[in-house]
């Protein structure tokens, strides 16, 4: 069985690292990795540590954590326990919640010189491929799990991805390793367990080389996806605006398939979950192609797709701030609601606002309804609704833009204009905005 150690060493030799972090679950896969790492550390002087994620889902979770610490002590390796809590009432699958929680707590341990080792093997890859096939995935999903991929500030490696579960268990038994068994692994209500117990045994008995065939298909899908993304990168540069929007005119130039892929690439650019095929079609038909006088929006999970001036935008759902108001004290920062940043009225020679005689009457609102103003350089007052349109403010930002008031009169609208009656050189209004990953 030394061929497994040789395979392991060869895998690690392909990639640069200064430190290795093992994700140690206590199962047979990660226990074999622990044994291989301990041997490699002694032979090559690797800097190795382990992290066990305690999900708290099983009554045996504490015992599993203790088992991992004990096994690490036996080989002289540090082991840290990370505790997570899962929102099991969220409606998401427990498998997905646990996976996301694991990656979330592992990420801070991985810097640019760290290689994170995960224990997935060839049978796991077969299951992942079949689950993607069941969902109707394209090349991205059918690429399944990558052997080597960026993670946090460093990279992750799955050195056993081409090794079968049978070979891993044989190695563990030969070397008298001990491991924990998650009792939930026998519950076929979970999709992966159903495949593991009732589907893949039939497939591997009929086609013994199916694991290798699936791995080849996954690699080909990954290659096709990489080529597609390389091609889309140039197209996206042309389609995306400086504000992060997506040009409808550019989308209209391409085929239906190109349009769909550009929309998906746009979501990826903003680090958002991929929209389904149905959702990309709805984005095009219901938002992009809506009538000119419409104000269309499509809500997808925790984001909305909106249209403004012939572009699509990804924005957080609108928050009703119509009832919010607060006094503004000169020289003091005013925290704004819903993560919109801070406001400060700052004394400044050469500013653009005249300070009123009674600054205690200054206040801030987000409600433009019924208000009028006459920007400096203009003649005659206009409704704020019309002024927002003239200044090119998207509809979803109009009730998230601070309005500085004096009694019942508009002094200025942050980052847009000062009313001519309040033009002066005493001070200026500064809006310190929060920087979100999704454009507003």
Swiss-Prot record:
PANTHER family: TRNA(ILE)-LYSIDINE SYNTHASE-RELATED. One of its GO terms (molecular function) is ATP binding. The N-terminal region contains the highly conserved SGGXDS motif, predicted to be a P-loop motif involved in ATP binding. Belongs to the tRNA(Ile)-lysidine synthase family. Its main location: cytoplasm. One of its GO terms (biological process) is tRNA modification. Keywords: ATP-binding, Cytoplasm, Ligase, Nucleotide-binding, tRNA processing. It is found in: Cytoplasm. It catalyses: cytidine(34) in tRNA(Ile2) + L-lysine + ATP = lysidine(34) in tRNA(Ile2) + AMP + diphosphate + H(+). This is tRNA(Ile)-lysidine synthase. GO terms for cellular component: cytoplasm. Ligates lysine onto the cytidine present at position 34 of the AUA codon-specific tRNA(Ile) that contains the anticodon CAU, in an ATP-dependent manner. Cytidine is converted to lysidine, thus changing the amino acid specificity of the tRNA from methionine to isoleucine. ATP binds at residues 25-30. Its EC number is 6.3.4.19.
């Amino acid at each position: 069985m030394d061929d497994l150690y040789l395979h392991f060493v060869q895998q690690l030799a392909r990639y640069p690292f200064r430190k290795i972090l093992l994700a140690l679950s206590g199962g047979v896969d990660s226990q074999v990795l622990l044994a291989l790492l301990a041997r490699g550390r002694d032979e090559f002087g690797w800097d190795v540590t382990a992290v066990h994620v305690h999900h708290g889902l099983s009554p045996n979770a504490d015992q599993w954590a203790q088992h991992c610490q004990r096994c690490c002590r036996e080989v002289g390796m540090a082991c840290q326990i990370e505790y997570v809590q899962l929102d099991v009432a969220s409606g998401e699958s427990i498998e997905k919640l646990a996976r996301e929680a694991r990656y979330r707590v592992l990420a801070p341990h991985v810097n640019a010189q760290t290689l994170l080792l995960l224990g997935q093997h060839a049978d796991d890859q077969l299951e992942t491929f079949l689950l993607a096939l069941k969902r109707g995935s394209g090349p991205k999903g059918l690429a399944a799990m990558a052997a080597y991929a960026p993670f946090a500030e460093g990279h992750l490696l799955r050195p056993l991805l081409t090794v079968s579960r049978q070979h891993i268990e044989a190695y563990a038994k030969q070397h008298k390793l001990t491991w924990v068994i998650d009792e939930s692994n026998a519950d076929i209500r979970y999709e992966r367990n159903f495949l593991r117990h009732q589907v893949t045994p039939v497939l591997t008995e009929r086609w013994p080389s199916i694991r290798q065939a699936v791995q080849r298909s996954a690699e080909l899908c990954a290659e096709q996806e990489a080529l597609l993304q390389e091609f889309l990168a140039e197209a996206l540069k042309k389609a995306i605006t400086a504000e992060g929007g997506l040009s409808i005119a550019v989308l209209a130039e391409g085929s239906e398939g190109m349009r769909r892929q550009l929309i998906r690439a746009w979501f990826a650019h903003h680090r958002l979950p991929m929209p389904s095929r149905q959702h990309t079609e709805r984005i095009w038909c219901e938002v992009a192609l809506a009538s000119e006088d419409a104000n269309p929006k499509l809500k997808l999970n925790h984001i909305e797709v909106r249209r403004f001036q012939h572009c699509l935008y990804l924005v957080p759902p609108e928050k009703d701030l119509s009832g919010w108001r607060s006094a503004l004290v000169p020289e003091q920062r005013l925290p704004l609601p819903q993560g919109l940043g801070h406001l400060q009225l700052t004394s400044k020679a050469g500013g653009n606002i005249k300070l009123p005689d009674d600054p205690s009457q200054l206040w801030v609102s987000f409600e433009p309804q019924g208000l009028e103003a006459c920007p400096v350089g203009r003649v005659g007052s206009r409704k704020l609704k019309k002024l927002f349109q003239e200044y090119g403010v998207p509809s979803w930002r109009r009730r998230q833009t601070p309005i500085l008031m004096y009694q019942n009169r508009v002094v200025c609208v942050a980052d847009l204009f000062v009313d001519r009656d309040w033009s002066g050189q005493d001070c200026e209004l500064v809006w310190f905005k929060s920087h979100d990953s999704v454009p507003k």
